[in-house]
Amino acid sequence: MSDYVYNLVKKHHSVRKFKNKPLSEDVVKKLVEAGQSASTSSFLQAYSIIGIDDEKIKENLREVSGQPYVVENGYLFVFVIDYYRHHLVDQHAETDMENAYGSTEGLLVGAIDAALVAENIAVTAEDMGYGIVFLGSLRNDVERVREILDLPDYVFPVFGMAVGEPADDENGAAKPRLPFDHVFHHNKYHADKETQYAQMADYDQTISEYYDQRTNGNRKETWSQQIEMFLGNKARLDMLEQLQKSGLIQR
C-alpha cells in the first residue's frame, strides 16, 4: 500500500504568492476533469466552475475580496452552486422540482458538491506542483460577484480558488490541525466538556508556539483567540437574503 496521496495531502498549505506564469489550457482542462470525477449527491452535479483569466474580471473580484492573489496567480476558479440547468429541466417536467432545488436540502447538496469538486482540483493541482488558496472572501459582496460573473437565478457563488506556481519567496507551511482525538469520535459523539476544554487548551498552546516560531515572536495568539475574533466579527450576515435572491433556500 502506497502512502503517496497521504503524504501529499499532509503537506497541504495555502499559497498566497505566485509566479507570474499562467496555467496552460491543457492543465486547466485536466484540473476541471479531475474535479468532475468527485462524488456527487444523487448524480445531481449541482455545481459549475467558472475559470477566469481576464485581468479586468480578476481586478473586479479583487475589489470584492480585498486580496491581491485574486489577481496575482496562474489561474482563478470560482465555484458556484448551480441549479440553473435543473431549472431548465423543470420547465418541461410534469412535477414541480423547484420544491427540491429551492429547499435548504438543495442548498446543502449544491454546496457539498462544489466543495468536493474543489478539493479534487486542489489535490490534483498540488500533485502537479502548483499551490492553491481558497477564497471565501468572494462572499464579501455576493451581489457584486453575481453581477461581475453574469450569474443567473439558481446560481450562487460559494468560493474561489487561486492556483499557480508558488513564488520563490513563498514560505508557507502546513499549520497544525486540531488533535486527532478531538475531531474523531468513535461510534458516537463525545461531548464531555472537561475533555473538550483540555484538548482545546493543548491545541491553543500548540498553535501559539507555531506562530511564535514562524514569526520570530511577533505573533502568539491561540486558536481560541482566532475563533473569538473571527466569529465575533459578525461578517456576511446577509447570506440568507442573498441566497433567496438567487432563488435558493426558499423553504
From Swiss-Prot:
Please state which protein family the record places this protein in.
Belongs to the flavin oxidoreductase frp family.
Pfam families to which the protein is assigned, alphabetical? Nitroreductase
Which NCBIfam families does the annotation name? PRK10765.1 (NF008033)
Name the UniProt record assigns to this protein: NADPH-dependent oxidoreductase
Q: Which SUPFAM superfamilies match?
A: FMN-dependent nitroreductase-like
Q: Does the keyword Oxidoreductase apply?
A: yes
Spell out the coiled coil positions from the record: none
Give GO MF terms, alphabetically: oxidoreductase activity
Q: What is its EC number?
A: 1.6.-.-
The answer to whether UniProt assigns keyword Transferase to this entry is no
Q: PANTHER family given for it?
A: NADPH-DEPENDENT OXIDOREDUCTASE, OXYGEN-INSENSITIVE NADPH NITROREDUCTASE
InterPro entries registered for this protein in UniProt: Flavin_OxRdtase_Frp, Nitroreductase, Nitroreductase-like
* Role of this protein: Reduces FMN, organic nitro compounds and disulfide DTNB. Involved in maintenance of the cellular redox state and the disulfide stress response.
Q: Report the cofactors.
A: FMN
What's the name of its gene?
Answer: nfrA
Q: Please provide the record's keywords in A-Z order.
A: Flavoprotein, FMN, NADP, Oxidoreductase
